[in-house]
Design a protein with these regions (language model features):
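Conserved alpha-helix/loop element of class I SAM-dependent methyltransferases that forms part
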Residues: 11-29
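A conserved beta-strand element that flanks and buttresses the S-adenosyl-L-methionine
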Residues: 100
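Short catalytic micro-motifs in class I SAM-dependent methyltransferases
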Residues: 103-106
Length: 176
């Protein structure tokens, strides 16, 4: 998965680097941190390694069991990292200094998405943050077409075939 996402999403590694840098502004001693849609736990590992001396509590949430197993294995040496195999919407969040979400909200039904954002906001400590990276729709059809074309060109440059790109696009219809 890690290889796939880096190949499929432009600037994916950069988004992790930026979130790591921004995290310094929001984390006090013993902060709670949630990574929503943690997949293989790579970001949690990087964040917990960066903050070894601060005794934070890290929670990775993903509803895909196989991802959680990889995330647990990847973070097994850090007792402060907990991986939860649950739907994000079902988790009762503790008061939190930082939420991160990397290209996850697009997979939550739009009817439930706003309720989740409200729940996140209510769980934030004063001065806390949600660092969110997400695919968005352009403000008009012409710019959306341009963005889609550039994105498809990027995927072709990464070695995906036009059939693979079309298949992925069809699989996401009705979700995004």
């Amino acid at each position: 998965f890690d290889k796939h996402i880096k190949k499929s999403v432009p600037l994916y590694e950069w988004s992790h680097d930026v979130a790591l840098k921004f995290s310094d502004f929001f984390l006090a001693e013993k902060s709670n941190i949630y990574d929503l849609g943690c997949s293989t736990g790579s970001f949690l590992k990087a964040l917990s390694n960066k903050n070894k001396d601060k005794r934070h509590f890290y929670y990775g949430i993903d509803e895909i069991k196989e991802m959680c197993l990889i995330a647990k294995k990847k973070n097994k040496n850090n007792k402060n990292v907990k991986i939860l195999n649950k739907k994000i919407e079902s988790v009762k969040f503790k008061k939190t200094s930082l939420f991160t979400s990397f290209y996850t909200m697009q997979f939550i039904n739009p009817r439930r998405r706003q309720n989740l954002f409200n729940k996140i906001f209510k769980s934030l400590n004063w001065g806390g943050a949600l660092i969110l990276f997400e695919k968005v729709r352009a403000p008009d059809a012409r710019f959306q077409d341009m963005t889609t074309q550039i994105y498809n060109d990027y995927k072709i440059d990464q070695g995906y075939s036009p059939d693979e790109i079309l298949s992925k696009s069809k699989s996401l219809k009705g979700i995004m």
